[in-house]
Swiss-Prot record:
<dbReference type="Pfam" id="PF02464">
    <property type="entry name" value="CinA"/>
</dbReference>
<dbReference type="InterPro" id="IPR001453">
    <property type="entry name" value="MoaB/Mog_dom"/>
</dbReference>
<dbReference type="Pfam" id="PF18146">
    <property type="entry name" value="CinA_KH"/>
</dbReference>
<dbReference type="InterPro" id="IPR008135">
    <property type="entry name" value="Competence-induced_CinA"/>
</dbReference>
<dbReference type="InterPro" id="IPR008136">
    <property type="entry name" value="CinA_C"/>
</dbReference>
<dbReference type="Pfam" id="PF00994">
    <property type="entry name" value="MoCF_biosynth"/>
</dbReference>
<dbReference type="InterPro" id="IPR036425">
    <property type="entry name" value="MoaB/Mog-like_dom_sf"/>
</dbReference>
<protein>
    <recommendedName>
        <fullName>CinA-like protein</fullName>
    </recommendedName>
</protein>
<dbReference type="InterPro" id="IPR050101">
    <property type="entry name" value="CinA"/>
</dbReference>
<dbReference type="InterPro" id="IPR036653">
    <property type="entry name" value="CinA-like_C"/>
</dbReference>
<comment type="similarity">
    <text>Belongs to the CinA family.</text>
</comment>
<dbReference type="InterPro" id="IPR041424">
    <property type="entry name" value="CinA_KH"/>
</dbReference>
């Protein structure tokens, strides 16, 4: 089954808004056994929308369309759909009833501008929208069933799950499967070298590299009938890349770390400087993190490091705030203040200013202290302020993950 996606909106083409809808649709279709063959983005222009619908309708079995169903003058999708389908707009009493009931719950009265959302292509089939004013609809254009949904992500996602996917799933001929391996701490070229010969020539398994800074994802795909080949290839890649593999499929670094912390029974405290609370935000993003995360300190200034973590002022004066000595003192102070089993600290120069020849922008120190030891390491990251902060945060999480894995597999610990 050939499926296309059409995204509508000036804001998508100007770069003001990232088109997360198209990505979500493609992802959910793939999980359901289908695959998007084409994706077009067009502006809020009736002629451009109608032309794209005609083109996609001639080459696809189904077209999933998002955007342009609102109440404002630039919402032209219904008009363009009617034109491409060779019909006209008519006032849908069912859509108008939905609008009035929705307005009564929210504001008590339907705004006159919203009435235009009930003008839909004649003979279309409606798609319920329990979360918003804009009902979706289905019309036949060319040889394709075209499914129209609003561009508001949480509305579109609900409609996709409850109406569109159930209708399309039974029409996929050969379902697709995939395995996503998530890596950190290795470059693409090094991955390619490690994987040489891992997937034999002629294998039905497809391999794609996807960089999602600071992670690299390896995506293996195959049809359902070739699932044994897919699992065999995934197993080979896991073995070759085990030193860098932190999660698979929908699991994130946060989830993996949460699992390890729960299994360890250890508690954690943080002391952050250049990351400004980013590490704590990632850890607490997982529900139930209060079972192991006690507290986080954002000690940005030298005075705060001394006042909150008892880092001696003379130590900062002698070695600088960005130093192994201060990172160690921050971790020790955080552990003592919280009464935790572990404490992780970070101090660094994110830029764009503050660097020196000895400690250029991107210099970061991480420290991890437990009951019997303290490990400190210096890193030299590249990039602008956002990239330095992002990779510092991720490195800290990965550092903690590796510590917990080592502790788990070391006899006499855990």
């Amino acid at each position: 089954m050939r499926v296309a996606v059409l995204s509508i909106g000036d804001e998508l083409l100007s770069g003001e808004v990232v088109d997360t809808n198209a990505s979500h649709i493609a992802d959910r279709l793939f999980q359901a056994g289908g695959r998007v063959e084409r994706h077009l983005t067009v502006p809020d222009d009736a002629e451009a929308i109608a032309s794209a619908l005609t083109e996609l309708g001639a080459r696809s079995d189904a077209v999933i369309v998002t955007g342009g169903l609102g109440p404002t003058p630039d919402d032209l999708t219904a008009e363009a759909a009617a034109r491409a389908a060779g019909t006209e707009l008519e006032l849908s009493s069912e859509a108008l009833d939905h609008l009035e009931r929705f307005a009564q719950r929210i504001t008590g009265e339907l705004h006159p501008a919203n009435r235009r959302q009930a003008l839909l292509p004649k003979g279309c089939r409606l798609i319920p929208n329990p979360l918003g004013t804009a009902l979706g609809f289905v019309v036949r254009i060319g040889q394709a069933d075209c499914f129209f949904m609003p561009g508001v992500p949480y509305e579109m996602e609900r409609m996709l799950e409850e109406t569109v996917l159930p209708e399309l799933t039974g029409r996929f001929e050969a379902g697709w499967q995939r395995v996503t391996l998530k890596l950190f701490g290795i470059a693409e070229a090094a991955i390619a070298e490690l994987l040489e010969g891992a997937i034999p020539e002629g294998s039905p398994v497809q391999l794609a590299y996807c960089v999602k800074f600071p992670e690299i994802h390896l995506i293996l795909r195959a049809t359902a009938s070739d699932a044994p080949f897919l699992q065999q290839a995934a197993g080979e890649l896991r073995q070759r890349l085990s030193a860098y593999l932190f999660a698979e499929d929908r699991e994130e670094m946060d989830d993996r770390l949460a699992l390890l912390l729960r299994e360890s029974g250890l508690t954690l405290a943080l002391a952050e400087s250049c990351t400004g609370g980013m590490i704590a935000a990632r850890i607490t993003a997982v529900a139930g993190s209060s079972a192991y995360f006690l507290e986080g300190n954002v000690t940005y200034s030298n005075e705060a490091k001394t006042r909150m973590l008892q880092v001696p002022a003379p130590l900062i004066a002698e070695h600088g705030a960005v130093s192994a000595e201060v990172a160690r003192a921050m971790a020790v102070g955080a552990r003592e203040a919280a009464g935790s089993d572990l404490a992780l600290s970070v101090t660094g120069i994110a830029g764009p200013d503050g660097g020196t020849p000895e400690k250029p922008v991107g210099t970061v120190y991480l420290a991890l202290v437990d009951q019997g030891s303290c490990r400190v390491e210096r890193f030299n990251f590249q990039g602008d302020r956002d990239r330095v902060r992002s990779i510092t945060c991720f490195t800290a999480l990965d550092w903690l993950r590796r510590y917990l894995l080592t502790r788990k597999t070391t006899p006499g610990r855990g």
